[in-house]
Amino acid sequence: MYLPISKSETRGLVTTLIVILNIIIYVLTSFENYFLNISNYWLEKLAYSPLLLYSGEWYRVFTSMFTHADIFHIFFNMYFLYFFGREVEKKIGSLKYLILYISSGLLAIVFHTAFISITSSIGLVTPAIGASGAISGVLGAYLLLYHRRVLTFCIFIPLPICFPSRAGVFLIFWFALQVIYGYLRFVSSIAYFAHAGGFIAGISLLYLFSPRTHDYRRFTIYNGVLYIVKTVRKGFGKFSKAILSILVLSLLIGSVYSITNSSKLNAMYVFNIATTSDGADISSDTAVYINDNDVILPTRDDPRVVFNRFLWSGLLKNEAKARYVDSDFKINLMIKDPVYGTNLNLYVAGFIEYDEQGVLKNFKGTITTDVLVMTRQGFIEKISIKPGVKYYATIESRVHGENIGLTILQPFSVISTIVSLTAMYIVLVKDRDLVEPEYVYEPVEYYNGYFI
């Protein structure tokens, strides 16, 4: 963990108010969990999920920006916001800063949604919370304004090691990690493309808000010699500009790809599964299916076994069975567990119905199958097969977010493309106009009382 340290005494009213508001909301939403993490109730009410936009719950794009998962999440977010935000607010003014903050958060959500077609379709239903996207916009603005400023950073591994570094080095390195981890689909609960999108949104928005006039003033110092004080704006160095350009270009390419690929995300299927075996009580659970690679399995054992058998055997989706209905369906198969590579017997009998896309719509009947039983002895995991386990099962599916790719993901991809193009232009051409100036003193020659 990197923590920036500075002696700056800048005060930012809006930054402080945003921090206080986030803390108040966290206290209210984590109270029942002893302030350690957010309660499930508030997570379901306030978190952002792209699929819920389809049902009109647009308020979540705002509420998710002020909601945090746990105490560490809010602590580090608010620390970085307070440290970097006050400087940006001082430079561009409180109102413009507030607009930049909120807009960066919204555009971070746009990028997070647009890049779902690249990362994983499960992101359509995965709740997202946190102010990180908006704060990333503040970091992007800070990079343009103060990339030459020297700060002290500390790494805790576990003892703190502190070292000086230019703000630009740290922020470009952090930005690179977000882009790289995002494209590598780094296994994490972090929305990397939301961070990256918020960052370049801050770069783009700063151009609208930051003053770009050069400051010239005359005054006399030392021996009556007249000087001009001129502000000189030094933009990014060649190496920094090259790295930033490559990173922004990668987001631009991803955005364009998302425009063409998002239309393939047509819908999401939610399966309600009820099973019983050997006279046991009925076990009910839910599964989510988008495609064969993007599946959320049931958490309960029996529904998960039944769902996996339909998934592995190709009975869950088969375009050849579009609109197929059979009240006396029977099939005997040998299937392979994709995790352990074990062959399993499967016999399915009962009523079965498929929709027009060839996705299982209804099933009511029996499933007889071999079941893998895993036992652990110390650090050793043993797998055995329990043959011929019979389940009585009912499966029903519902379609959610039909044409969500065209109605939400594709428009968001267009917006992310525009923001990426704008950020690229600013990094390549306008960086000198935005950086906080350095002051140079130049003597002025004069003859006969006239300045020339």
How would you name each of these model-derived features?
Residues L3, F35-L36, W312, Y340, ...:
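Short, aromatic- and cysteine-enriched interfacial helices/patches
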Residues M1-G279, N291-N293, P298, E396-D431:
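A detector for small-residue-rich transmembrane helices and their helix-helix packing motifs
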